[in-house]
Amino acid sequence: MKEKVVVGMSGGVDSSVAAYLLKEQGYDVIGVTMQIWQDQDVFVQSQEGGCCGLSAVDDARRVAERLEIPYYVMNFREDFQKYVIDYFVSEYEKARTPNPCIACNRYVKWESLLHRSLEIGADYIATGQLPNGRYTIRNSVTAAKDQTYALYNLTQEQLSHTLMPVGDYDKPHIRQIAEEIGLPVATKHDSQDICFVPDHDYSSFIAQETGKESMPGNFVDEEGNVMGQHRGLIHYTIGQRKGLGISSTTPIFVRELRPETNEVVLCKSESLFSHDCHVDNINYMAEEKLTEPVRAIGKIRYSHAGAPCTLYPQPDGTLLAQFDEPQRAMTPGQAAVFYQDDHVLCGGTIEKE
């Protein structure tokens, strides 16, 4: 009897080719698109390359018809609201910079989809993610599109039921396969933005969710001297230079957000660099738990190339990451992910420098 696999189909080329490859490998493939957005107007206007708009559903359905596999749209709105939107808003209200895609991967695209898939008798779920899976995840062959940073907090149970069939292919090869078999999404652009804020106006979105406007306050320098007025903490993130509206003879950047005093601390570039950061909410992938210092490569944001560091386990279960060279703008709320030999060792949330 064929093993059954549910493929999360975003309407993009990666998940479409993943479904094709799994069918070729002999699996009983079912395509599913996750309907996650509550606001129908935003759902309709979601950008062409997005993963949750009407165009995504239409594209995924056309691919499923071309591959001759069953296809369904499943409602995950409640889970998306709880685990992604509410988290996103809460973090910004705390003057932190969240990773909504990481939360979506763990709690919606994996936990919720896997639960629903096992209920209908599936053995696995599969995605178009580009890493390669105690279970671990290896860097993709496509460094520019590697998604392991956003997958660090998957559980062992989730990984044991996960297939990632395109992990050994680079993006040009994936598009080539799609063209060769006549998939209608072969040249479709990759999605880049947060899908539920297509206009990038985070402050208006958060105001709509909370019913509260962000409060103006003071820009201050590192000594506490007032430099001007800011528009509200949610408009700023660590390392930001543009849009400050402050005149200065030298470039200035956001150094710190202080929700307790509603202040934005500004600094010169050199003050953004530091060697250490504390990381909490650790998910261990290649180890049960660290008990002694280890060497690793640390990534402190999605676009970060990674840098050598030493991880020091702390008595409270957190990690102190000490980088060999100072790193720029380590930002509370962002994920820090650590690698050994191209495999994800562990990761967590940056709490402070």
Where are these predicted regions, by residue range?
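ATP-dependent adenylation/nucleotidyltransferase module used to activate substrates
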Residues: M1-Y152, L163, P172, E179
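AMP-forming adenylation/ATP pyrophosphatase catalytic core
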Residues: A126-N132, T136-E353
